[in-house]
Amino acid sequence: MIARHVPMKEAKLSSFAGLAKYITNSQEKQERVGEIRLTNFQSESLDWAVTEALHVQQRNQRAEGDKTYHLLISFAPGEKPSAEMLRDVEDRICAAIGFGEHQRVSAVHHDTDNLHIHVAIN
């Protein structure tokens, strides 16, 4: 398993809303997106969770840089952890890098040879 920060280079991904839309969009591929998870939000709706995250970002006057962090967690080809294990891995990694209590949208992707999780962290 490899976890890494993905720099927000593309303009369409440089906002929380853009990244959340990208990672949860099936792009008309039946097997692309698996479980979508919302963590530390009041809402259980993706649209409302994104709105909530954007309001939190607007209130944050201290942060000068990008307020969205894109984390990618990749597994070895052929490795297929259970949904419970994937949630646990995400929770542990986010806690380890100091984002355990932050709002996040995550999506499991099956569109490559290796299973991976994209995590948009506010």
Residue ranges and their predicted role:
Residues 1-122:
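N-terminal nicking endonuclease/strand-transfer module with a His-rich metal-binding environment
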